[in-house]
Swiss-Prot record:
Name of the protein in question: Ornithine decarboxylase
Region (Disordered): 83-102
N6-(pyridoxal phosphate)lysine modifications at: 288
Organism field: Leishmania donovani
Record's GO cellular component terms: cytoplasm
Length: 707
């Protein structure tokens, strides 16, 4: 199927747990020249209030491309002007201008009525691609620079410049946006098209939509095969070089080396989702979570600021020219080393977080131009990673901090908090915002006018599994929007945040190879316990130990430092999840089946569907064994799975680990000389807002014939 290249974003868009509605079906045409079929998705809409500038918005909508107009109509989005006047503040440093901007163009909460705090929110966007298309449409020339909310777009770039900047990053890192479609997906699309071509009612099975796991599995198979081919090509080139008498260069990597597949499109999608859910809050990406240059460059292009914890991170951001000015950086380490303070002063960084009087004294001596943001303690008892034991001033200590700031002549300009990472208690966010408001009032009594609210980070970046009890980002956003509007909706407060894992967690998938194994006899006690649990096959009462080429000293440091629980998936484990079959056979098997429902109106995006053959492979899964998995180093503590049920593996098997994009590579070392160096760049979304592609039938397959 290599000749059937279909845009990846139109083939592998996955169904997010929080976006159940189906995405639009791509336009399909006969090679005989029949009329194309257009379908729009159907879902409940949420009406917005009329735009403030109806005449200008109406004129802009009249000039919109039909596809763009359909997007706005589909999600009930109205164009409106935004408050683009940046907040001015007095700067106490000698020799500088009287007034300066707050973190470059960070949007302010305008004066709006807060009777209905959700009235300015749009309907949930069903498609990842639609989210991205809407993000780049907002503020563009196509809509006369108008916004979809009362808040200006992030950063200093225009909409067109943002898109061009992201495209340039993709070009620099050779990001692959086109991959072959799976035979099952194209066969399923062909069958539904031919069968229901003239009908508005078609059977749709939600369970057939390609999930994020299936997406990663499909890419994993492609790139493991690519590694073998690249290694063979390198060997041929080395042989040719040796024949000519030159010393052959060492290969970039071996075919069995571990590697990352990095989906930069997911980062773009997450920014689009953030803008949709929290348009009043500008994100300052936590560099510590993933300092990969490509990730930083994409986020810079999208208008993010940066949360830096050290002078090295400040140098990284400024050296790569990722910000318009140092005011796009917040030095968010409450306890800073003296050298870092000196360097921040030299670099022109202004905004720093503080949580104790000694820090106020240090800042007054070493960073006199700083504007302090008081970090307060929050209730993070239900967080996966809590920080209040180390950072944050209790509310009863805030007055002492304000007194110290006045004593040492340090300007206090705002309040920050962090409720911890993975905090499922939504009330913690509300309480923290209200506590911050209380500090705003206290600051006035000491002669300080606070104009910045930093709501921290820790927002979830992965899909919420139904029944897990975890809280989605959308649910958190719905919780904090009303309280932000109620307490900080007066127009004189800049609201920022410090998300890290939110942007990158789901953007990386790790592939690692099994390079050794052995078995150990289980003790009688362990045999009895495992037999009682009836979990694993006890025909061979042994512990199976495997060795893989990434471990605790490298990507899996997140187990120790981030309290993470990575998911290990065995590729080609015999359950059909990775199976590939002929298009004809798949189409034949994908017939009437249980669970199909008839939906009137729009069809789902056919290339998203996996065939019934994919889900009904008769191969039995490999037997479950008591399994321990070690990393590659000589340390016996390098263990990522210990005596747990796992499918039996063999030498050369690949393990897929999704959601490995935050606090993994950032803290990875080179212990014993091991490292994961190979990176493969892809994008699951397209950057071009345009109609869906047109497909034509050729026998039993579909071919993309237009962009």
């Amino acid at each position: 199927m290599g000749d059937h290249d279909v845009a990846l974003c139109h083939v592998s868009r996955y169904n997010h747990a929080n976006y159940w509605a189906f995405v639009p079906l791509p336009t399909v045409s006969d090679d005989t020249g029949c009329d194309s079929l257009h379908h729009d998705s159907a879902s409940e809409r949420i009406r917005m209030a009329p735009p403030a500038s109806a005449s200008k918005a109406g004129a802009a909508e009249e000039r919109l491309h039909p596809y763009e107009r359909r997007l706005l109509d589909q999600y009930q989005i109205h164009l409106q002007p935004a408050n683009r006047n940046p907040l001015s503040r007095a700067d106490s440093a000698a020799g500088r201008e009287e007034t300066a901007q707050t973190p470059a163009q960070v949007q302010m909460v305008p004066v709006v009525a807060v009777a209905d705090s959700t009235s300015d929110q749009h309907a949930s966007v069903a498609s990842s691609q639609d989210l991205v298309d809407l993000f780049f449409l907002e503020g563009s020339q196509a809509v006369d620079g108008l916004c979809f909310s009362p808040y200006p777009i992030y950063g200093w770039r225009t909409a067109e410049e943002r898109r061009a900047a992201v495209c340039e990053v993709f070009k620099t890192y050779n990001v692959v946006t086109r991959l072959p479609a799976s035979p099952a997906a194209l066969a399923a699309a062909q069958r539904r098209y031919s069968r229901h071509r003239h009908s508005a009612i078609a059977p749709i099975n939600k369970s057939a939509i390609e999930t994020r796991e299936q997406y990663w599995r499909r890419l994993s198979n492609l790139y493991t095969q690519k590694g073998v081919k690249d290694a063979a090509s390198a060997a041929d080139a080395a042989a040719t070089t040796a024949t000519n008498g030159a010393v052959p260069a060492a290969p970039a990597y071996e075919p069995e080396d571990p590697f990352y597949i990095i989906d930069l499109g997911r980062v773009v999608e997450q920014m689009a989702r953030w803008r949709h859910e929290l348009p009043m809050v500008r994100p300052y990406f936590a560099v510590k979570s993933n300092p990969q240059p490509a990730v930083l460059e994409v986020l810079s292009a999208l208008g993010a600021g940066f949360d830096c914890a050290s002078k090295e991170e400040i140098h990284m951001v400024l050296g790569r020219q990722l910000v318009a000015s140092p005011d796009d950086i917040i030095f968010a380490n409450p306890c800073k080393q003296l050298g870092d303070l000196r360097e921040a002063q030299a670099c022109g960084v202004t905004y720093v977080t503080v949580d104790n009087p000694l820090e106020m004294e240090k800042i007054s001596r070493l960073m006199p131009s700083a504007h302090a943001i008081i970090r307060i303690k929050t209730n993070d008892s239900k967080a996966q990673c809590s920080f209040s034991t180390k950072f944050g001033a209790p509310l009863e200590d805030v007055e002492g901090l304000l007194e110290a700031a006045r004593q040492f002549n340090v300007t206090v300009c705002g309040v920050s908090f962090h409720v911890g990472s993975g905090n499922d208690d939504q009330s913690a966010y509300v309480s923290a915002v209200r506590d911050a408001y209380q500090v705003f009032q206290q600051a006035v009594q000491y002669g300080f006018k606070c104009t910045i609210l930093d709501i921290g980070g820790g927002f979830p970046g992965t899909e919420v599994v139904e029944g897990s009890g975890n809280t989605s980002f959308e649910a958190i956003a719905r919780t904090i929007r009303p309280v932000l509007a109620e307490l900080f909706g007066g127009g004189d407060v800049t609201i920022i945040s410090e998300p890290g894992r939110y942007f990158t967690a789901a953007s990386h998938a790790l592939l690692m190879n099994v390079f050794a194994s052995r078995t150990l006899r289980l003790s009688d006690v362990e045999v009895s316990r495992q037999a009682f649990q009836s979990v694993v096959s006890m025909d061979e009462p042994e512990e199976y130990q495997y060795y893989v080429n990434d471990g605790l000293y490298h990507s899996f440091n997140c187990i120790l430092f981030d309290h993470a629980h990575p998911t290990l998936l065995l590729l080609n484990d015999g359950d059909g999840a990775d199976g590939v079959e002929s298009g004809t056979e798949a189409a034949a098997v994908c017939s009437e089946e249980e669970g199909e429902t008839s939906l009137s109106g729009p069809l789902a995006n056919d290339p998203l569907f996996m065939s019934a053959w994919d889900r009904r492979r008769s191969f039995a899964r490999r037997p479950l064994r008591i399994t321990t998995i070690f990393g590659p180093t000589c340390d016996s503590m390098d263990c990522i799975l210990k005596k747990q049920p796992f499918p039996e593996m063999k030498l050369g098997d690949w393990l897929l680990v999704p959601d490995m994009g935050s606090y993994t590579t950032a803290a990875a070392g080179f212990f014993n000389g091991f490292a994961t160096r190979r990176l493969e760049w892809v994008s699951s979304v397209d950057l071009c807002a345009r109609p869906r592609p047109v497909y034509t039938r050729e026998g039993n397959t579909l071919r993309c014939v237009s962009e």
